[in-house]
Amino acid sequence: MANIHRPRRGSLAYSPRKRAKSQVPKYHSWPARDGEPILQSFAGYKVGMTHVIMVDDHKNSPTEGKDIMVPVTIIEIPPMKVAAIRAYTADTYGKRALTEVWTEQLSTLLGRRITLPKKYSEEAGFKALSEAVAAGTVTELHALMYTQPDTLTGVPKKVPELMEVCIGGGTLEQKVEFAQSIIGNEVNLADVIGAGEYADVTAITTGKGTQGPVKRWGIMLRKRKHSRGGKKRHIGNLGPWNPHHVRWQVPQMGQMGYQQRTDFNKRILKIGENGTDITPAGGFLHYGLLRNPYVMIKGSVPGPVKRLIRIRPAVRKGEHHARVPAIEFVSTQSKQG
């Protein structure tokens, strides 16, 4: 007897598959953390891929202790700046913003993204924030950070990207002190996460435009005599006679790509300061020369070259412990074929 088991093609987990509202990914959850306060996210721009030769340090691996070739993604990570501190409170309707403290040292380029406050007292803002913390109305503290793409040569833009980053660890009083120390200053990736640790990488994927159901959902092409009707890359039917409408689960053509996706537990192999050491001959394809600090991540990450990539400490930590990998060779061979 024939096997009638036939699962549906494609996943409904991300429906509706429509374009992302912004190229800046958003996080709605943060890893639990103890100890001193720390920022829990960073952002950079995707440069390209290469490969390295490193020692396999995974315990019980068949190649443990031997040299292996690993594909890596390079992300350029110029320092980010902290523009403001935002306090949240919780009520019966959920979480909402309570107050904000803006720095007086804002980049003029940030004015192309948002309307900058003209007259603002940072000291008065922190005084009001401390009073709110003492009253017990503050539940979370977040930092508003922005990138500095004007320092890059591979990304043709000057307007910064503004994003919200949670401040984790410590008590609320310690978080306020930490916020006072970072507001208006530059922050590096090494202040968030270190080499050998695992991170979640989020980006807006490469846009494919409007695609048919075969490529978009992975349905089968019509076989044999069914393909003679002139519709080989279409679904067999749109559904039953009743109900008198097409169900949303039916695979149809539409937008493919340009959606937010997260890769969990990506290992950070190296955080470097001088990008010229790993720039291949002729530069990275569609990017050019790498001159700023960079991070080397094992495997691939979502999005095309020059796309904004957000990095967050892993929220689903695996069994592997953080160890600084022993990288013996980084390929700088030309990627132009």
UniProtKB/Swiss-Prot annotation:
One of its GO terms (biological process) is translation. Coiled coil: none annotated. SUPFAM superfamilies: Translation proteins. GO terms for cellular component: cytosolic large ribosomal subunit. GO terms for molecular function: rRNA binding; structural constituent of ribosome. It comes from the Archaea. Keywords: Ribonucleoprotein, Ribosomal protein, RNA-binding, rRNA-binding. Pfam families: Ribosomal_L3. Part of the 50S ribosomal subunit. Forms a cluster with proteins L14 and L24e. One of the primary rRNA binding proteins, it binds directly near the 3'-end of the 23S rRNA, where it nucleates assembly of the 50S subunit. Belongs to the universal ribosomal protein uL3 family. This is Large ribosomal subunit protein uL3. It comes from Methanosphaerula palustris (strain ATCC BAA-1556 / DSM 19958 / E1-9c).
